Amino acid sequence: MSTARPLKSVDYEVFGRVQGVCFRMYTEDEARKIGVVGWVKNTSKGTVTGQVQGPEEKVNSMKSWLSKIGSPSSRIDRTNFSNEKTISKLEYSNFSIRY
């Protein structure tokens, strides 16, 4: 039996021009390409928030995308990450947009 790579979970909130620019759709697409699970949703204060889970290197790739790239029409001012922790199993089976 091979040693499983540690799984990570992290919450995020993205600030800037991230609503009305297909940010959630692009986030969902990118998460599926990278191979992480979790969710994304708009907040009432104009930010986008969510959670990402998966192998550490894939979570790190998604964190980079959420910090620097986003959707083509977005402008990311900053991204806050919180509650980063190692988990024993994934809490989600896919990545979804929440409303």
Swiss-Prot record:
Domain Acylphosphatase-like, first and last residues per copy: 9-99
Entry keyword Acetylation: yes
Catalytic-site annotation from UniProt: R24, N42
Main EC class the enzyme belongs to: hydrolase
Keywords annotated in UniProt: Acetylation, Hydrolase, Phosphoprotein
Domain of life, per lineage: Eukaryota
Enzyme Commission numbers on file: 3.6.1.7
Modified residues (Phosphoserine): S93
GO molecular function, one term: acylphosphatase activity
Secretion signal span: none
Record field: catalytic activity: an acyl phosphate + H2O = a carboxylate + phosphate + H(+)
Record's keyword annotation contains Hydrolase: yes
In-chain residues carrying the UniProt-annotated modification N-acetylserine: S2
Pfam families: Acylphosphatase
Function: Its physiological role is not yet clear.
Family designation: Belongs to the acylphosphatase family.
Protein name: Acylphosphatase-2
